[in-house]
């Protein structure tokens, strides 16, 4: 099988830089074309030793296009670029929101997918010190990714999977599911709940410091317990030992004092749709 021709649109931005740097590491597998509109982005591409390609030329040559643009611009920009794709092209977006909100422009003769990183898990063994310091992924730290095929050809989507595994490399597993299921992972699982709780934990460290507790001690105590308790609750400790009776009481109190009684409604389809609409258009909140 020949090399896959991959264009990265938005290659001078944050995610465009990350993904294109990794794809460039495998020239024997990928012919890489970098597309960027902004002056700063073009300069960033040149500073990394590459040359930008005009978008018309890139789209004409591409087997797969990586659409590394901000989520809030996917609807607007896909309406410009998708009509220019050659028939049969694979088109990868990096977040499911625009697809779930039906703002992504589609074509019947092209294949569309979502590819999003899980980021390195603290339960995943890394091979080197440098890999353990990669908190985001894609810079040495192994991670999993999630993907969906929005529509299109299975063989072309298989190419999209290979592209995604390299642009987020090193990748352990690529879990394929629906775009809606990815959206329940983010924003519902990791942003509405996870990030909110973790932000509150960081604020709680500040409260500990106000009470004379050294910040280093509070951070160590908090993160150590997060590691231990998440291992316990998620089944990573052999035998699934129960937490202490006192901890169970504290969890019950926390559910009353910290969590809303109806917090699980964030898993309702209606809530998800309103959350996504608000995230894509914060000037028109739906919830």
Swiss-Prot record:
Keywords: Carbohydrate metabolism, Metal-binding, NAD, Nucleotide-binding, Oxidoreductase, Zinc. Coiled coil: none annotated. The keyword Oxidoreductase applies. GO terms for molecular function: metal ion binding; nucleotide binding; oxidoreductase activity. InterPro entries: KARI_N (IPR013116), NAD(P)-bd_dom_sf (IPR036291), PGDH_C (IPR031663), Semialdehyde_DH-like_C (IPR037161). Pathway: Carbohydrate metabolism. NAD(+) binds at residues 13-15, 36, 71. It catalyses: D-apionate + NAD(+) = 3-oxoisoapionate + NADH + H(+). Its EC number is 1.1.1.421. The keyword Cytoplasm does not apply. Zn(2+) binds at residues 116, 186. Its cofactor is Zn(2+). Belongs to the ApnO family. Involved in catabolism of D-apiose. Catalyzes the conversion of D-apionate to 3-oxo-isoapionate. This is D-apionate oxidoisomerase. It comes from Blautia hydrogenotrophica (strain DSM 10507 / JCM 14656 / S5a33). The gene is apnO.
